[in-house]
Amino acid sequence: GEIGEGAMATHSAKKMQGKSIRKFRDRYRIPIPDDEVESAPFYRPPEDSAEIKYLRERRSALGGYLPTRREIAPALPIPDLEIFEPLLAGSGEREISTTMAFVRILTLLLRDKKIAKHIVPIVPDEARTFGMEGLFRTIGIYSSLGQLYDPVDADQVMFYREDKKGQILQEGISEAGAFASWTAAATSYSSHGIQMIPFYIYYSMFGFQRIGDLAWAAADMQARGFLLGGTAGRTTLAGEGLQHQDGHSHLAASTIPNCIAYDPCYAYELAVIVHEGLRRMYQDNEKVFYYVTLMNENNVHPQ
C-alpha cells in the first residue's frame, strides 16, 4: 500500500518498522493486536475460516500437498521395425539425404492408424527447407481458427494449408515457442494422461545452443520425444554464413543425462534409432528423449 508505493526503498532494507507494519496489518486485515504487531508474529487463520477452506479446496483440486508424477497414460502399440522396410532396403542408385529419409519415416508413421493421431510434427519456419511441404496437404497445419486467407501458393499441389484439425505445429521463427510446444506434448503423458510423440525438427545450430536451458528444464520434467537437428555439420548451408554451421550441438546434448543423442549417416541407421526410441519411450516408459542430427548432403544409402 502507501508505505511502499512510489518509495525508492533500498534493497538493503531488511525489515519493516512499527508504523509500516501496522499499516500493512490494517491493509490486509490481519487480526494481530497493537502490542504484538512490532514482533511480526506468524498468523494462521482458523481451520474453519474462508481462507483456509479455499486453500485446502485448491490444493485438493491440484492433486494433493506433495508433488507427484502421474503415470496413467497407457503404452502405445509401436509398429514393428518392418514398417520402415523402404528405408532398411537402401536407396538403390538414388542419392538421398538423411533429412529426406526422416521425412519418409515420419510419413510412414503417420500412415499407421494406431499411432498416427499421437504424432506431433513441429517446425519453427523451415518446413520447406526440410522437404516437409507434402505434409501440408495430407495432415495440414494446425490453426485454432482455420485458414482465414488464400495462401500465395494456393494454385500449387502442396500449398500452405491451415486447418482446425491440422496436425503440424508451424510456429514461425520462434525456437523457444516451438520448443515450448514440444515440451507440452512431451510431458502430456503425465499432465493429461495421453502419450504424444513430438518430432521437433529445426536447424541444428538453433537448438541446444539457443534453447539449451529449456532442454534441461524438459529433461527435469522427464519429457519424452524426438528432437531433430536438421542441416547439421559444418559443410551445410555454408552460403548462409557461419550461423548455420553446427559442429558442436552434440557436446551440448551430452550435458543432459537423459538425452539420447545420435549422428547417423544412413537411412537404415536412422530408422532403427527412431524405432528403438519409440519402443523405449512409449512402450517401456523410459524417461528419456532423443536428439538426432540430420544432414542435407545426398548420398547412396546401403541396406
Where are these regions (language model features)?
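Thiamine diphosphate
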Residues: 40-302
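Conserved P-loop NTPase catalytic core
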Residues: 13-45
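Short, conserved loop/turn and helix-capping segments at secondary-structure boundaries
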Residues: 11-18, 243, 247
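Conserved RecA-like P-loop NTPase helicase motor core
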Residues: 2-4
